[in-house]
Amino acid sequence: YSAVTADLQIQDVVNATSAEIINGDIQATHLQGRVKLETVNGDINLTNVAGELTVETVNGDISGHHTGTQDARFVTVNGDMQIKSKSALLRLESVNGKIDFSADNVTELDLTTVNGAVTGRVNLAENGDINGTSVGGKLDLTFDKDISARFDMQAHAGGSIVNKLSDKQASKAKYGPNKWLEFTIGSGSARVELSTVHGHIR
């Protein structure tokens, strides 16, 4: 389905759903199967959406709850994102926007932000994997107390690293404005790699 200058409400679809709207919002409720939603100059709101999911906005916000464990990808350009997800494989990407998310039992999490901020609560599966990058932005992640992972963090071009999981603090390069921090919590079964250019990791 595609439309220009129109709002769209989709609900109770159990098969594949694809919608592209220009100058309008999408409200998606109780969807299953493969779901792909796109807007330009519009917002997308999700309520009880399961299945493999791709959501993209330009000049619009994304909000809601993805209840399925299938792969999910959310992308905003000049918009904010507020997402709760149970996806095992979750990708969040933003340019000039904020990401606020929670991920439950995630196996693979990819975070990318340019000139934005990422704030998230993460329940990382055993042997899970997180890759996060920011350019001129912030990565602020909170983990469960029983987290078991190897952490590798790097900050370039004047970026900063704050560690509240252990007593270990970042090392600073002898030459150049670079910092790095490596440590392990628990058995280190999972892996967390975060990097920033002229941004902050916390």
Residue ranges and their predicted role:
Residues 1-202:
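Intrinsically disordered, low-complexity terminal regions
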